Amino acid sequence: MIPKKTKLKSREIEVPGDKSLSHRSVLFAALSKGKSKVTGFLEAEDPLNTMSAFAKLGLKVQKVKPGEYEFESPGKNKLVSPNVDLDFGNAGTGIRLSAGLICGLPGINATLTGDNSLKKRPMGRIIKPLSSMGASIVGLGEKETAPLKIEGKKLKGFRYESPIASAQVKSCLMLAAISSETDLEYSENILSRDHTENMFRFLGNKIEQISPLHFKIKPPYVLNGGEFRVPGDISSAAFFLVLGVLAKEGNLLIKNIGLNPARTGILTALQSMGAKIEIQNKRIECGETVGDLKTYPSNLKKSNIPESLIPSIIDEIPILSVAGFFAEGGFEIRHAEELRAKESDRIHTMVSNFRELGIEVEEYTDGYSFDGTSKKSSEVWTRLSTVKKIPIQSYMDHRIAMSFLIFKTLSGLDLQIDETSWIETSFPGFEKLLESCINE
């Protein structure tokens, strides 16, 4: 087995606010006439870019203190066309959800763009159903990618059966229907995250739930603003969960984490591998389940990850793969082709980096696998422990960079990650917090 070297300080930590909820708080604040307030807002590049975009549409923004903002909107029907392109940077959630909202606003003309990574990500998955609602939206890049040119108009009611389990597609269409005061019937084959539905209900709206995978919404919609409290992001906590369960000693108590049932797949996956993680102080805040997570040093083993779990762990698969390297029996992920449409092609990026480390990895169209028997893992670790400056490519992807920083900490290997600035898109202060957990 790979020897456990990392000793942690037993301490409480907090991670930044949930990125998904931070984006959505801005969108609902813009839709709602009057004042809204958000605490726990993630002050990272992605949600701040969404905030900046809607400020250009007429949303007034005032920062009260770190993580706390007050918004004032003239109401969705009095938002204005921006005089510059709306730049979402690397925020796929921001551009897709905002596109839906803006499509349903008659008289608003806007071009939504982003960085080179975002311009490669698929937008046809929202363009097609939005167009069926009567939206005027065109992907100006190759293969219907960003920039997105939108001319807002009154949309028609729509029934959509999504071929993929995607909270972004679902939320995009919901926001289009809400902004245009029309009805939407939506169904999917596997349950995706329901943050938009929860925030929508929290504001006083009703959803007709036909089945767990099938719902309807219809006007009139309640859009009077509210006070949102954003919990810590479980996708960010995942890095410290893996650090905690693979440490030689020490316990981490990660406070105030969002435990939405559609997001806790990382807990299910890690616990099925033998991770000891305890949920404490579980409660409901602003329509979302929240709690504290305590980690204990654990011995991990290979576990089969079912297809039904993939949508709820899609962002955590890179760090879960790192845990797999330390697990007896290895690691396999399948039915995860959505990884190829993230900030990078995460199947390719993880496979290529693991191969750079000398790990024999089998790549599939929908995932990858590697053998984690004690002998092979130990041989790889023994060889690498004598190598200096092992190159790791982040591929402009924050989760790849953070995953291999955790790998570096746990393994003690001299990994040289090409660029870590991408981490700022979701987790400012990550490296400093990581260093503070280590007991030298």
UniProtKB/Swiss-Prot annotation:
Its main location: cytoplasm. This is 3-phosphoshikimate 1-carboxyvinyltransferase. Catalyzes the transfer of the enolpyruvyl moiety of phosphoenolpyruvate (PEP) to the 5-hydroxyl of shikimate-3-phosphate (S3P) to produce enolpyruvyl shikimate-3-phosphate and inorganic phosphate. One of its GO terms (cellular component) is cytoplasm. Signal peptide: none annotated. Gene3D superfamilies: Enolpyruvate transferase domain (3.65.10.10). Monomer. The gene is aroA. Phosphoenolpyruvate binds at residues 19, 92, 121, 168, 346, 399. Pathway: Metabolic intermediate biosynthesis; chorismate biosynthesis; chorismate from D-erythrose 4-phosphate and phosphoenolpyruvate: step 6/7. It catalyses: 3-phosphoshikimate + phosphoenolpyruvate = 5-O-(1-carboxyvinyl)-3-phosphoshikimate + phosphate. InterPro entries: Enolpyruvate_Tfrase_dom, Enolpyruvate_Tfrase_sf, EPSP_synthase, EPSP_synthase_CS, RNA3'P_cycl/enolpyr_Trfase_a/b. The active site is at 315 (proton acceptor). It is found in: Cytoplasm. 3-phosphoshikimate binds at residues 19-20, 24, 166, 168, 315, 342. It comes from Leptospira interrogans serogroup Icterohaemorrhagiae serovar Lai (strain 56601). One of its GO terms (biological process) is amino acid biosynthetic process. Keywords: Amino-acid biosynthesis, Aromatic amino acid biosynthesis, Cytoplasm, Transferase. It is an enzyme of class 2 (transferase). Its EC number is 2.5.1.19. Belongs to the EPSP synthase family. CDD domains: EPSP_synthase. It comes from the Bacteria. One of its GO terms (molecular function) is 3-phosphoshikimate 1-carboxyvinyltransferase activity.
